[in-house]
Amino acid sequence: LPEFAKAIPVCKVRGRDLVGLPLKAPLTSLPRIYSLPMLTISMKKGTGIVTSVPSDAPDDYIALMDLKRKPALREKYGVKDDWVLPIEIIPIITVPYKRDDSPEDQDPEMTDLAAQVACDEFKVSSQNDKPQLLLAKAKTYKLGFYEGTLKIGDCKGMSVQDAKAHVKM
C-alpha cells in the first residue's frame, strides 16, 4: 500500500471500554443515548459503535429487551438503569406483516415495529435464541427492504428501495 493508505493506530480501545459512552443521535427524542453491549457483537475484535434500529432489526430489538428485562445482565456489563430503561423504540419503517402461520386469504397487517412482531412470531425471547433470531431477521430485512416505507427523515414516505438509491446519489 502507498504510505498515505496505511492506518496509523492512535490508541487501543477495548469494546467493553465503549459501554456507557454518552452519544448524541439524530432522530431521537432523548438528549443523549449510551453505547450498549450486544451479545451478537464480539467485544474482542473490531471495536466500534453502530446505530441500533430496534424497530426493524430483531438483533437490536431483543438486545434492548434483554437489557431492559434483566438487571443481572445490566450489572454484568456495567450498564446503568438510566442508560436503558427510558429508551422507547422509535418506529422508522412501516411494513405489511403477515405471520407465516396466518391463513392464506388473510391480508397482512401494517406495522412499524416489525422486529418486535417477528420476535413474537418466531418466539425469540433472548439473544441466545440464535436459530429463531435468524428467521426473524431474514423476514424483517426482506420485508423492510422490498415492501417498507420510511416514516421519518428526509426520505419520509419513500420506499426503502428508493430511499437507498436516493441516499447513494
Language-model features: where?
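Protease-associated
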Residues: 1-49, 59-62
